[in-house]
């Protein structure tokens, strides 16, 4: 009897016949079906075969099953049908003598039974029976019926060694390949910034290169920093016409360091020089040099300057250089600190043995105090340009630049806005006009009015406007608190003038008193500083005098923080106390956390006690003056509070007019009515 075989991998069944004839398909010749052996032990099968071999086995099994389903059992036309049979039906067939042969697998738990099926016209049916176990009773019954039965061991398919090797390696190769593709995609290898050579390109510079920079910014767009702009215009002129300078022996500056607080236009100046110079321009952030891999930062510095030298003359702009140029030798990370290696390479490239002729490095930072001294020396950064907050003229010029695309009502004056915004940076002024435009659009206006400008200034300085308080003790307390600030400030010689008093909450403050700061905030006298302490304590003094010492509230917490810091500065920084003209800044005053940890406090215990005593003396003296002014002007305070509770906002002119009816304002604190349109500095509760 010829045979063909198929394998059922799922249930461990092997079907063996001798030959197949595809008569129903109209085929005249016989064909043999490839024999596929399968292990009946699933755990061993999964452990020995790989993913690729499993797919091949399943495909072959499917072909075998299709072939065997249409085959005849033998040449006499006796068919074989494959199916399952329950154990109870198997016992019934056994009792009736219909069982011809039994093959036992899996330690007697699976039986392949050849039985005569009446449903198939007494043809032999080959079925699979799940046995509860190989019992002695079943064996005795098989012997009694003289049935041919045999037990078989599980057969292992050793297969081809090459296929087994491929199967074993398929999953690890697919896993590693998938991880590699994911790393390339996340690092830019699939079209991102990393490039197709990742990770080989990890040491290459990430600087953005522009052969013909088109930043959309020129020197005409930069205002309020005339000194810095002049320095950059000289650099641009040197790049365009170097012969004018080399004829008299001048050399081009190797580096320009921009130093200033945030928002003053350092990056804007870099964009302007890129748009004006007409030479290749490289731009990169200091944080892009340092990675988690050792040596990457130094490698990127080398690659950056290599590209720059190939395109010289050119400009390299490093934004936030303090990320890589921090002072060395702090002991943090030791001598192998990655940042120090990167900085060492940067120092070498800027002014080392080889030099970098034709490459101008422009860097920006707002933390020049923590930069390494070797980085700041001439030859590396020949010029240090200070970009501070603009003065009145600078603010006016900046407002003209940012107001070009905005519509204003006829009563709006940019000069007045500039006067009202001392201490505002260029970014603050741009944000101010943008907020005013948003408010105008929200209110359905076609042009920006002074009302939107006022509200925008209040919003930027003090925060969002809150819900107005309802009448009651809390509102009355806030009113007395704010009027206390205003009265003590107005009656103390040297204090800033009151701009307005309001009970409209903004941010965390439930009420605000706005003052007009001095024209030059960089030069402040001892009298002015002490007057600010008195004015700051006026709110707490008003609460104590009006409501009693036991009714003072936490509303003065921010005032106390400000006046304590100001008094400490007068003693330790400005030398304005009985201790003498000493600068006594301790380690806690250091701006950098590492320097703060490394700094040694050389102050003696007695000197520290003297400082605390001097600070307390200043505060106590100021508080006594504030209490005296509140007690002596109780009638004026009650009148002003009554009007303020009704109107909720009072201008500085109106406040001074009412106060002058009850007491005399010091001559130096008297202001003209027009000044009330100047800038606010809030004192809040």
From Swiss-Prot:
InterPro entries: AAA+_ATPase, AAA_lid_3, ATPase_AAA_core, ATPase_AAA_CS, FtsH, P-loop_NTPase, Pept_M41_FtsH_extracell, Peptidase_M41. It holds the Pfam family AAA_lid_3. The chain crosses the membrane at residues 162-182. Its EC number is 3.4.24.-. SUPFAM superfamilies: FtsH protease domain-like, P-loop containing nucleoside triphosphate hydrolases. The active site is at 482. Signal peptide: none annotated. Binds 1 zinc ion per subunit. This is ATP-dependent zinc metalloprotease FTSH 8, chloroplastic. The gene is FTSH8.
